[in-house]
């Protein structure tokens, strides 16, 4: 499995791996939902699409916070994650649906959306210009989007700590900043240029900084086990043997322990929040 998972990876093994770690991922990333949903400006009933919805946690939170009469549709390329989202969605709630979709090839919806939102779902497209041009067609004229991406590696030590620990026991290739991956848009100007080229207007990017509870608030040893199991770089240990895995896990646990308070590891994070609109 690549350190830089592309869309095809998420449709297969990467999606399965993420589903297996939803118990820790969703509470860990939940703090990002607050600024993300606030930026949507849900001030009246509207149609909302959650792009790269994963297991549906953010989608369900949007429905809880949206005005009565709103509808929320979640889309993801991973069959495993859509299956999980459907399993947790209320069967008697017609205002929320989940569907399998590859945004780079999916047809433009007949009825466009008033809001588009994505929490860490727009960094993995194989052909970004095509994908963002498609997304522009998903948004109604005058509609608003909010996309979250990770800031720089230096400002997200919970992820760089994993790379450092793994690199102590095996050779880790240099990260390709142009490839699909979590830090693809660490330089926010890259995504702003793509969004501008896709025809979006009123573009802004603001940074959210806060502490994330690793694995949902696990102690250091358990957090290290979770992080290696959940991360794409942890997958590079496959085939290295149990001794290498144990060494990387112990090294990571020691790094995490420096950030443990009250029995839980919490580490700083920086997230870019991009907003804009479709002219009209």
What role is predicted for each listed range?
Residues 3-9, 21, 26-29, 55-57, ...:
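Conserved Class I S-adenosyl-L-methionine
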Residues 68, 139-144:
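Short glycine-dipeptide loop
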Residues 37, 60-63, 132-136, 163:
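A structural alpha-helix within SAM-dependent methyltransferase catalytic domains
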Residues 114-129, 151:
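A short SAM/SAH-binding and catalytic strip from SAM-dependent methyltransferases
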Residues 47-106, 130:
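Class I SAM-dependent methyltransferase SAM/SAH-binding core
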Residues 104-116:
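A short acidic, Gly/Pro-enriched loop at the edge of an enzyme's catalytic core
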Residues 129, 144-216:
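Conserved catalytic/acceptor-binding region of the Class I
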Residues 1-46, 57-61, 81-84, 102:
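Conserved class I S-adenosyl-L-methionine
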């Amino acid at each position: 499995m690549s350190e830089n998972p592309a869309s095809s990876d998420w449709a297969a093994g990467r999606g399965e791996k993420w589903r297996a770690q939803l118990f820790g991922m969703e509470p860990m990333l939940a703090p990002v939902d607050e600024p993300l949903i606030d930026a949507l400006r849900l001030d009246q009933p509207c149609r909302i699409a959650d792009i790269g919805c994963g297991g549906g946690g953010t989608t369900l939170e949007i429905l809880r916070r949206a005005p009565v009469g709103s509808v929320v549709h979640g889309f993801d390329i991973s069959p495993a994650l859509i299956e999980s989202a459907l399993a947790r969605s209320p069967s008697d709630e017609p205002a929320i649906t989940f569907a399998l979709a590859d945004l780079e090839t999916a047809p433009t919806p007949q009825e466009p959306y008033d809001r588009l939102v994505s929490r860490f779902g727009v960094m993995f497209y194989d052909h970004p210009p095509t994908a963002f041009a498609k997304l522009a067609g998903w948004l109604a004229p005058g509609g608003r989007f909010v996309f979250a991406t990770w800031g720089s590696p230096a400002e997200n030590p919970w992820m760089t700590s994993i790379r450092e620990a793994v690199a102590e026991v095996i050779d880790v290739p240099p990260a390709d900043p142009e490839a699909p991956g979590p830090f693809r848009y660490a330089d926010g100007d890259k995504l702003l240029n793509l969004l501008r080229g896709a025809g979006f207007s009123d573009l802004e990017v603001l940074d959210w900084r806060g502490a994330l509870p690793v694995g949902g608030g696990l102690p250091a040893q358990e957090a290290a086990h979770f992080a290696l199991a959940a991360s794409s770089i942890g997958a590079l240990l496959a085939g290295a043997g149990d001794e290498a895995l144990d060494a990387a896990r112990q090294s990571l646990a020691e790094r995490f322990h420096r950030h443990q308070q009250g029995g839980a590891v919490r580490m700083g994070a920086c997230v870019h929040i991009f907003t804009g609109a479709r002219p009209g």
